[in-house]
Amino acid sequence: MTDTLDLDRAVATLTQGGVIAYPTEAVWGLGCDPRQEAAVLRLLEIKRRPVEKGVIVVASSVDLLRDWVDIDALEPARRQDVLASWPGPHTWILPVTARAPRWVTGEHDGLAVRISAHPVVAALCAAWGAPLVSTSANLAGEPPARSRAALDPALLATIDGVVDGETGALAQPTQIRDARSGQILRD
Protein backbone atom coordinates (compact mmCIF):
# COMPACT_ATOMS: atom_id res chain seq x y z
CA MET A 1 0.00 0.00 0.00
CA THR A 2 1.26 3.47 -0.89
CA ASP A 3 1.91 5.74 2.10
CA THR A 4 -0.33 8.71 2.82
CA LEU A 5 1.88 11.78 3.18
CA ASP A 6 1.30 14.92 5.21
CA LEU A 7 2.75 18.11 3.71
CA ASP A 8 6.11 17.78 5.51
CA ARG A 9 6.59 14.21 4.30
CA ALA A 10 5.45 15.17 0.80
CA VAL A 11 8.07 17.94 0.67
CA ALA A 12 10.74 15.53 1.94
CA THR A 13 9.72 12.99 -0.72
CA LEU A 14 9.88 15.62 -3.48
CA THR A 15 13.28 16.81 -2.24
CA GLN A 16 14.58 13.24 -2.53
CA GLY A 17 13.40 12.99 -6.14
CA GLY A 18 10.21 11.12 -5.34
CA VAL A 19 6.95 10.97 -7.27
CA ILE A 20 3.69 11.65 -5.44
CA ALA A 21 -0.03 11.63 -6.23
CA TYR A 22 -2.41 14.37 -5.11
CA PRO A 23 -5.89 15.70 -5.92
CA THR A 24 -6.27 18.67 -8.27
CA GLU A 25 -9.17 20.75 -9.61
CA ALA A 26 -10.76 17.85 -11.54
CA VAL A 27 -8.60 14.71 -11.41
CA TRP A 28 -5.77 13.17 -9.41
CA GLY A 29 -2.32 14.29 -10.42
CA LEU A 30 1.22 12.99 -10.27
CA GLY A 31 3.95 15.36 -9.22
CA CYS A 32 7.68 15.61 -8.75
CA ASP A 33 10.42 18.23 -8.63
CA PRO A 34 10.68 19.58 -12.19
CA ARG A 35 14.23 20.78 -11.47
CA GLN A 36 15.37 17.14 -11.07
CA GLU A 37 15.68 15.53 -14.49
CA ALA A 38 15.77 12.00 -13.05
CA ALA A 39 12.53 12.62 -11.12
CA VAL A 40 10.71 13.92 -14.21
CA LEU A 41 11.98 11.07 -16.39
CA ARG A 42 10.85 8.57 -13.74
CA LEU A 43 7.39 10.16 -13.60
CA LEU A 44 7.13 10.03 -17.39
CA GLU A 45 8.25 6.40 -17.39
CA ILE A 46 5.58 5.58 -14.78
CA LYS A 47 2.93 7.22 -16.99
CA ARG A 48 4.42 5.82 -20.20
CA ARG A 49 4.37 9.38 -21.54
CA PRO A 50 6.97 10.55 -24.07
CA VAL A 51 9.26 13.34 -22.83
CA GLU A 52 8.61 15.21 -26.09
CA LYS A 53 5.07 16.04 -24.93
CA GLY A 54 6.22 18.12 -21.96
CA VAL A 55 4.38 18.47 -18.66
CA ILE A 56 2.31 21.03 -16.77
CA VAL A 57 4.00 22.84 -13.90
CA VAL A 58 2.09 24.35 -10.96
CA ALA A 59 3.38 26.83 -8.41
CA SER A 60 2.16 28.98 -5.55
CA SER A 61 3.17 32.21 -7.29
CA VAL A 62 4.25 33.52 -10.68
CA ASP A 63 7.58 34.57 -9.17
CA LEU A 64 8.54 30.91 -8.70
CA LEU A 65 8.18 30.39 -12.47
CA ARG A 66 10.18 33.39 -13.70
CA ASP A 67 13.40 31.39 -14.23
CA TRP A 68 11.57 29.29 -16.81
CA VAL A 69 8.86 31.50 -18.31
CA ASP A 70 8.91 35.05 -19.63
CA ILE A 71 5.45 36.36 -18.83
CA ASP A 72 6.66 39.88 -19.60
CA ALA A 73 7.15 38.86 -23.26
CA LEU A 74 3.37 38.66 -23.64
CA GLU A 75 1.33 41.53 -25.01
CA PRO A 76 0.03 43.58 -22.04
CA ALA A 77 -3.62 42.55 -22.56
CA ARG A 78 -2.73 38.85 -22.71
CA ARG A 79 -0.46 39.14 -19.67
CA GLN A 80 -3.34 40.77 -17.78
CA ASP A 81 -5.69 37.92 -18.82
CA VAL A 82 -3.22 35.36 -17.48
CA LEU A 83 -2.57 37.14 -14.20
CA ALA A 84 -6.29 37.87 -13.62
CA SER A 85 -7.11 34.16 -14.00
CA TRP A 86 -4.76 33.09 -11.18
CA PRO A 87 -4.97 31.58 -8.73
CA GLY A 88 -7.53 29.41 -10.42
CA PRO A 89 -8.18 26.43 -12.69
CA HIS A 90 -6.51 27.97 -15.72
CA THR A 91 -3.45 26.46 -17.40
CA TRP A 92 -1.57 28.74 -19.77
CA ILE A 93 1.24 28.07 -22.22
CA LEU A 94 3.80 30.81 -21.61
CA PRO A 95 6.97 31.63 -23.56
CA VAL A 96 10.04 29.96 -22.05
CA THR A 97 13.43 31.32 -21.12
CA ALA A 98 16.69 29.63 -22.11
CA ARG A 99 16.79 28.12 -18.59
CA ALA A 100 13.61 26.05 -19.00
CA PRO A 101 14.69 22.39 -19.05
CA ARG A 102 13.76 20.26 -22.07
CA TRP A 103 12.66 17.41 -19.83
CA VAL A 104 9.85 19.77 -18.70
CA THR A 105 9.03 21.63 -21.94
CA GLY A 106 9.44 18.64 -24.24
CA GLU A 107 9.71 19.67 -27.86
CA HIS A 108 7.77 22.90 -27.26
CA ASP A 109 8.81 26.56 -27.11
CA GLY A 110 6.29 27.20 -24.35
CA LEU A 111 5.58 25.77 -20.91
CA ALA A 112 2.14 24.91 -19.53
CA VAL A 113 1.81 26.54 -16.09
CA ARG A 114 -0.91 27.08 -13.49
CA ILE A 115 -1.22 28.89 -10.17
CA SER A 116 -3.86 26.70 -8.55
CA ALA A 117 -6.55 27.70 -6.06
CA HIS A 118 -7.29 24.05 -5.21
CA PRO A 119 -6.67 23.79 -1.45
CA VAL A 120 -4.42 20.71 -1.56
CA VAL A 121 -2.43 21.90 -4.59
CA ALA A 122 -2.08 25.41 -3.14
CA ALA A 123 -0.97 24.09 0.27
CA LEU A 124 1.46 21.62 -1.30
CA CYS A 125 2.97 24.29 -3.57
CA ALA A 126 3.27 26.76 -0.69
CA ALA A 127 4.95 24.16 1.56
CA TRP A 128 7.22 23.02 -1.29
CA GLY A 129 8.21 26.59 -2.21
CA ALA A 130 9.15 25.67 -5.77
CA PRO A 131 7.39 24.64 -8.99
CA LEU A 132 5.84 21.16 -9.08
CA VAL A 133 5.04 18.90 -12.02
CA SER A 134 1.29 18.30 -12.33
CA THR A 135 0.17 15.63 -14.78
CA SER A 136 -2.82 13.34 -14.54
CA ALA A 137 -2.34 10.23 -12.40
CA ASN A 138 -2.99 7.64 -15.08
CA LEU A 139 -1.12 5.69 -17.68
CA ALA A 140 -0.97 7.45 -21.07
CA GLY A 141 -4.19 6.85 -22.97
CA GLU A 142 -6.15 5.73 -19.92
CA PRO A 143 -8.88 7.85 -18.30
CA PRO A 144 -7.73 10.04 -15.40
CA ALA A 145 -8.69 9.09 -11.84
CA ARG A 146 -11.30 11.32 -10.20
CA SER A 147 -10.87 9.84 -6.71
CA ARG A 148 -8.14 8.17 -4.69
CA ALA A 149 -10.09 4.91 -4.88
CA ALA A 150 -9.98 5.13 -8.69
CA LEU A 151 -6.16 5.34 -8.82
CA ASP A 152 -4.68 2.38 -10.67
CA PRO A 153 -3.13 -0.02 -8.12
CA ALA A 154 -0.26 -0.73 -10.54
CA LEU A 155 0.46 2.99 -10.74
CA LEU A 156 0.26 3.36 -6.95
CA ALA A 157 2.82 0.58 -6.57
CA THR A 158 5.36 2.65 -8.55
CA ILE A 159 5.11 5.99 -6.71
CA ASP A 160 6.41 7.17 -3.34
CA GLY A 161 3.28 8.45 -1.62
CA VAL A 162 -0.13 10.10 -1.78
CA VAL A 163 -1.26 13.45 -0.39
CA ASP A 164 -4.88 12.85 0.61
CA GLY A 165 -7.82 15.06 -0.25
CA GLU A 166 -10.69 15.51 -2.66
CA THR A 167 -10.66 16.72 -6.24
CA GLY A 168 -12.30 20.05 -7.00
CA ALA A 169 -15.61 20.67 -8.72
CA LEU A 170 -14.37 20.78 -12.33
CA ALA A 171 -15.91 18.12 -14.55
CA GLN A 172 -12.86 18.02 -16.86
CA PRO A 173 -9.14 18.71 -16.45
CA THR A 174 -8.26 22.40 -16.69
CA GLN A 175 -8.43 24.13 -20.04
CA ILE A 176 -5.02 24.76 -21.60
CA ARG A 177 -4.68 27.99 -23.57
CA ASP A 178 -1.66 29.44 -25.35
CA ALA A 179 -1.15 32.89 -23.81
CA ARG A 180 0.72 34.09 -26.90
CA SER A 181 -2.06 33.39 -29.41
CA GLY A 182 -5.14 32.82 -27.26
CA GLN A 183 -5.61 29.41 -28.93
CA ILE A 184 -7.31 26.77 -26.78
CA LEU A 185 -5.24 23.57 -26.87
CA ARG A 186 -7.38 21.53 -24.46
CA ASP A 187 -10.95 22.43 -23.59
From Swiss-Prot:
<dbReference type="GO" id="GO:0005524">
    <property type="term" value="F:ATP binding"/>
</dbReference>
<dbReference type="GO" id="GO:0002949">
    <property type="term" value="P:tRNA threonylcarbamoyladenosine modification"/>
</dbReference>
<dbReference type="InterPro" id="IPR006070">
    <property type="entry name" value="Sua5-like_dom"/>
</dbReference>
<dbReference type="Pfam" id="PF01300">
    <property type="entry name" value="Sua5_yciO_yrdC"/>
</dbReference>
<keyword id="KW-0808">Transferase</keyword>
<dbReference type="InterPro" id="IPR050156">
    <property type="entry name" value="TC-AMP_synthase_SUA5"/>
</dbReference>
<feature type="domain" description="YrdC-like">
    <location>
        <begin position="4"/>
        <end position="187"/>
    </location>
</feature>
<comment type="function">
    <text>Required for the formation of a threonylcarbamoyl group on adenosine at position 37 (t(6)A37) in tRNAs that read codons beginning with adenine. Catalyzes the conversion of L-threonine, HCO(3)(-)/CO(2) and ATP to give threonylcarbamoyl-AMP (TC-AMP) as the acyladenylate intermediate, with the release of diphosphate.</text>
</comment>
<dbReference type="InterPro" id="IPR017945">
    <property type="entry name" value="DHBP_synth_RibB-like_a/b_dom"/>
</dbReference>
<dbReference type="GO" id="GO:0006450">
    <property type="term" value="P:regulation of translational fidelity"/>
</dbReference>
<dbReference type="InterPro" id="IPR023535">
    <property type="entry name" value="TC-AMP_synthase"/>
</dbReference>
<comment type="similarity">
    <text>Belongs to the SUA5 family. TsaC subfamily.</text>
</comment>
<protein>
    <recommendedName>
        <fullName>Threonylcarbamoyl-AMP synthase</fullName>
        <ecNumber>2.7.7.87</ecNumber>
    </recommendedName>
</protein>
<dbReference type="GO" id="GO:0061710">
    <property type="term" value="F:L-threonylcarbamoyladenylate synthase"/>
</dbReference>
<keyword id="KW-0067">ATP-binding</keyword>
<dbReference type="GO" id="GO:0005737">
    <property type="term" value="C:cytoplasm"/>
</dbReference>
<dbReference type="GO" id="GO:0003725">
    <property type="term" value="F:double-stranded RNA binding"/>
</dbReference>
<keyword id="KW-0547">Nucleotide-binding</keyword>
<keyword id="KW-0819">tRNA processing</keyword>
<dbReference type="GO" id="GO:0000049">
    <property type="term" value="F:tRNA binding"/>
</dbReference>
<keyword id="KW-0548">Nucleotidyltransferase</keyword>
<keyword id="KW-0963">Cytoplasm</keyword>
